[in-house]
Amino acid sequence: MIVRERVDGDLDGCVDALAQVHDCDGYPNMWPQNPHRWLSSPTVVKAWVGESDGRVVGHVAVDREVAGAPTTAGSIAVSRLFVHPHARGNGLSGALLDAVTDFAAESQLELVLDVVEDALPAIALYERRGWVYVDERLADWTRTDGVRPVERRYRLPR
């Protein structure tokens, strides 16, 4: 497994991996109308992929928005973190988060993120890695079942 900066040619592989994650875990909660654009929205500052045997199997980005609103001055949000179900269990999620953490440290930015409260494996990962719970709120979007999930907000101390 290697982690490297994402390039435009990676997007098809990212979408393929994301589709597998969506089928397995329901992430993202609502499949984007244009997944290529969802992964490379104008607010994305930088993105990385995890690659195994020449295939994209993981992804993470940093974004100027969190939960649909601009981040505060001096912070940047982790977004679009996912790992293909067949590539899990080897530390790739942590390696992708390391890339984000290194970027934030070099840029002197605080990292923040939001995660739905029922994403227990993701929450466990963040808390194991030192992320601190800040607060929670109802999401400004609804799931396909009409429920507005609770989003937990975290920050990573510098």
Where are these regions (language model features)?
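Conserved N-terminal entry element of GNAT/NAT acetyltransferase domains
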Residues: M1-G9, R152, L156-R158
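Acetyl-CoA-dependent GNAT
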Residues: E5-H86, G94-A99, F103
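Active-site acidic-Proline motif in GNAT/NAT acetyltransferases
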Residues: H84-H86, N90, E117-D118
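PDZ/PDZ-like domain micro-motif
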Residues: A87, W141-T142
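Conserved active-site alpha-helix within GNAT-family acetyltransferase domains
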Residues: G94, D118-D135, T144-V147
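Conserved GNAT acetyl-CoA-binding A-motif
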Residues: A104-V115
